[in-house]
Swiss-Prot record:
Residues 334-360, 530-551, 708-798, 813-842 are annotated as: Disordered. GO terms for cellular component: Noc1p-Noc2p complex; nucleolus; nucleus. GO terms for biological process: ribosome biogenesis. The keyword rRNA-binding does not apply. It comes from Schizosaccharomyces pombe (strain 972 / ATCC 24843) (Fission yeast). This is Uncharacterized protein C4F10.09c.
Length: 860
């Protein structure tokens, strides 16, 4: 039975093998290469490698011949293309006169049909990539990227014609030359393509740069060709001015390391080149460091971890020296001071404001950079195998910096030393000596790194098993607190509280008595005097730190032929020792904390009492809550701020927390304004110690206001009662006073005029009283009791005194209707008209009256 085969298309034929099986040959007639086979998989005759040197001119001739043969084969392929007449005509129309998108689509079809025959189409696509239109250029670049990843590039690096190992062989055919010529063309073409990407990666438009970063990452991930140049481009984008681009580049590098773990060492070396380049900015270093410290390491990648440690230490040393130079350069000169003092010069004020903003931004970046270095050291050390010699070299450099640099720099260096030492599970005595010495540094008072310093102090002491050394630190912490500001004192007390909780043996410093030298017993030793004994009476062996060997002192004297030596052990505390573990703090009492029990700052006093009596301290320390600025901010009453937006999830971003979260100046932690009745109505036990001053102040003001209003009301009522009694007595003596107002011959117009004059006089006197009351209220807040009583008495004498809580709308910005005020206004007008009638009647009274009518009043 005959086998049926599909009808071949024009230009195709059926090829039968020896077994009689037929296959359709997709290769058009007259074409040397099958378009269905990738160009790098085309079967070629095997050649033996020939290492014979080939002349450069001969290589150029071979390449020219290969390109010429390839061009002729491409023309034959286009003539016998397996498209219908209509399809071929449509493609030619789109390429010649279509839109850019249509041209790109048509050229893509030609390249996909047979890449080795589409040299002209590839060159046309590359020309579109260089257009000024960003949309067209990015579209063509994305199309070429898809072609390269989709099969145009092999999974190996391309070679130029001169790099072919079999070029000098005698059996080289035209097929070899055509394939090698196309590969050489493609390598040059790909390099030009990367150059266009590099130019567009510095474009002013953000979306163009973002697309270029994505293209570079995709090419790096998929193909090895030009990976060194592509990696350099990707890492250079860490220094982009746009933070979004730098962040995207950092993320792309980490994704590349996850896809190709073997490239971590290559990537790290390239990052090392970038971070130590002179043109790399501080912000670029930050993005570079967070890329390095987020590199995932394993115990098999020791070389990568060692390189990271080397980068961190070298960069940290260079950074500290750069910061020192910047501090010297930013020191204000006389000319700068004169400009700053000129308050009328608006330009200098604006320049100073811009300079302050710049310095603030630089300090923020510097702190982030140092934090990134410390994080990287902490993560890389467990996987590194740094030899002792190199580690000691790094440590010696860092310790030298602590003694010469500024205090802020010294704190950061100590943090790095602690991180590195803790990673090796060994913290030297040299580190604790430096930390112990830093407590006496006078620059600690004005340092902006107090929070970092306290954290370092806590982390260093909480893991120290040397109890006498920890006791010495606690003694010195209390001693230096005597001249420090309350924010730092509260922080030190919090550190001590945590140490006492963690180590119960430290509690004896608050309960046991002080041990002195005279508390120990002296021991006398008698021995015969040797002839070769030294005649010196006193001799003491001391080490370089000034401490006596075995903590003992000796004295000797000779009685006859008998030498008597007394040996006395030093037990008292000596705070002058350089090494804290030899200061004898284990037998000392913490008597220095006694003055803090009555400290002027309520929080310091509370913390001191809690330490002495062993009470628990609630909450976390926040140094900013105890500053003078924070205290004064509480007098700025304003509406609570809106809740802050949720923070990101970056590992480099700290989480929000603590009692200061959402805290608004002028309010308690619950958000209740201090000048409201809701705050003053609380019990005193519910008020934090740092809010007691405000609680007492507003409570006293509220009570005095109530008393003043009550006294005013009582006097008004007494006056009205006396006036009613007088009126009743007059009516009893003169019944004709009950006549109607119409019968009275009293001129109401004259009375109104007289009352108006009286009202103006009373208003003038009231204004004078107001001025006097305002002047009395402008006295200092902290006054003695006599002044306060005088102020209260003066408030009672004036009718128009303004009370603190008379109208809550004066303090709280709420829009409510004042119905009570309207009612009071109506009552006041009615009272005024009633008094007016009484005054009219009193004017008609006779000058003389019977004494009997007033007898009962005179008796009282």
């Amino acid at each position: 039975m005959a086998t049926l085969y599909p009808k071949p298309k024009r230009g195709q034929k059926i090829i039968f093998n020896e077994e009689g099986e037929g296959t359709i040959d997709t290769k058009p007639q007259g074409v040397m290469f099958d378009p269905g086979v990738p160009w790098y998989n085309i079967p070629l005759p095997e050649l033996h490698e020939d290492k014979k040197f080939v002349n450069v001119d001969h290589v150029s001739e071979l390449e020219t011949r290969g390109l010429l043969l390839l061009k002729e084969d491409s023309e034959r392929f286009s003539e016998t293309l397996g498209h219908g007449t209509a399809d071929k005509r449509m493609l030619q129309t789109l390429i010649s006169s279509g839109t850019t998108s249509d041209r790109i689509s048509a050229l893509t079809l030609l390249v996909q049909e047979s890449p080795i025959h589409a040299v002209k189409a590839l060159e046309t696509l590359l020309s579109i990539c260089s257009k000024k239109s960003r949309n067209e250029a990015t579209q063509a670049i994305t199309t070429l990227k898809d072609l390269f990843i989709g099969g145009l590039l092999p999974d190996r690096k391309l070679k130029y014609m001169k790099q072919q190992s079999c070029l000098g062989s005698k059996n080289v055919t035209d097929k070899h030359l055509m394939v090698w010529a196309f590969e050489s063309f493609l390598k040059s073409f790909y390099f030009k393509y990367i150059q266009i990407i590099e130019a567009l990666s510095f474009d002013a438009l953000l979306f163009v740069k973002s697309q270029m970063v994505s293209t570079i990452y995709d090419l790096l991930k998929a193909k090895p060709e030009q990976e060194q140049n592509l990696l350099k481009l990707l890492i250079n984008k860490l220094g982009d001015k746009e933070n979004k681009i730098a962040s995207k580049a950092s993320y792309s590098i980490l994704q590349l390391e996850a896809s190709h773990p073997a490239m971590k060492l290559v990537i790290t070396k390239e990052i090392e080149r970038f971070i130590f380049a002179p043109s790399t900015s501080r912000t670029s270093c930050y993005y570079t460091l967070i890329t390095l410290n987020q590199t995932v390491l394993t115990h098999k990648q020791v070389d990568v971890a060692n390189l990271l440690i080397e980068i961190y230490f070298v960069f940290f040393t260079k950074l500290l020296f750069a910061l020192e130079k910047e501090e010297v350069a930013d020191a204000p000169t006389l000319e700068k001071k004169s400009l700053q003092s000129d308050s009328k010069n608006k330009k200098s004020q604006k320049r100073k404001k811009d300079e302050d903003l710049r310095k603030e931004a630089e300090e923020n970046v510097n702190s982030r950079v140092i934090s990134a270095v410390l994080t990287g050291v902490n993560r890389a050390y467990p996987f590194a195998e740094v030899n002792s010699e190199k580690f000691d070299k790094h440590m010696n450099t860092l310790f030298a910096i602590t003694h010469t640099a500024s205090f802020n720099t010294s704190v950061q260096v100590l943090m790095l030393i602690f991180q590195a030492s803790a990673s090796r599970d060994f913290i030297s005595d040299r580190y604790y000596k430096s930390l112990y010495e830093s407590l006496l540094d006078p620059r600690l008072t004005t340092s902006s790194k107090q929070s970092l310093y306290l954290n370092l102090l806590y982390k260093s002491l909480i893991i120290d098993n040397n109890i006498p050394r920890v006791r010495a630190f606690i003694k010195r912490m209390v001693q230096v607190s005597a001249w420090q500001q309350p924010p730092l004192v509260t922080g030190l007390f919090h550190v001590m509280h945590q140490l006492v909780i963690a180590t119960t043996a430290l509690r004896s410093m608050f309960t046991n008595a002080e041990i002195h030298d005279f508390d120990g017993d002296e021991e006398e030793v008698f021995k015969d005097v040797e002839e070769d004994d030294v005649s010196e009476d006193q001799k003491v062996d001391s080490d370089k730190d000034g401490k006596l060997s075995d903590k003992q002192s000796h004295s000797a004297y000779v009685v006859g032929n008998v030498s008597v030596s007394t040996k006395k052990e030093h037990l008292s505390y000596d705070g002058r020792k350089r090494d804290p573990q030899y200061s004898n703090a284990d037998g000392s009492c913490l008597w220095e904390i006694h003055p803090f029990l009555n400290h002027f700052h309520p929080t310091v006093s509370l913390l001191a009492k809690s330490l002495v009596y062993g009470e628990k301290i609630l909450g976390k320390p926040n140094l900013s809550l105890h500053t003078l600025n924070h205290f004064l901010d509480k007098f700025a009453y304003r509406n609570p701020k809106k809740s802050a937006a949720a923070r990101g999830h970056s590992i480099m971003q700290p989480l929000a927390g603590g009692l200061s979260k959402g805290y608004v100046p002028g309010s308690t932690y619950s958000g209740v304004p201090m000048n409201s009745e809701q705050f003053t109505s609380k019990k005193q036990e519910e008020i934090p110690v740092d809010e007691l001053f405000f609680y007492r102040f507003f409570n006293d003001k509220y009570i005095k206001g109530k008393q003043a209003r009550k006294t005013k009301v009582d006097r008004d009522e007494e006056g009205e009662i006396d006036e009613d009694e007088v009126w009743k007595a007059l009516v009893d003596s003169k019944p004709q006073l009950e006549m109607d107002e119409e019968e009275s011959d009293f001129d109401s117009e004259e009375m109104d005029k007289a009352m108006t004059d009286m009202g103006s006089d009373s208003e003038q006197s009231a204004d004078e009283n107001d001025n006097e009351s305002m002047a009395s209220e402008e006295k200092p807040m902290f006054s003695d009791e006599e002044n306060l009583s005088e102020i209260a008495h003066s408030e009672d004498e004036f009718d128009d005194t303004v009370d603190f809580f008379e109208d809550e709308n004066d303090l709280l910005p709420f829009n409510e209707t004042d119905d009570e005020e309207e009612i009071q206004t109506v009552d006041h007008s009615e009272t005024h008209s009633h008094k007016k009638k009484k005054r009219k009647a009193i004017k008609d009274l006779p000058v003389f009256a019977d004494a009997e009518s007033y007898a009962h009043l005179l008796e009282n």
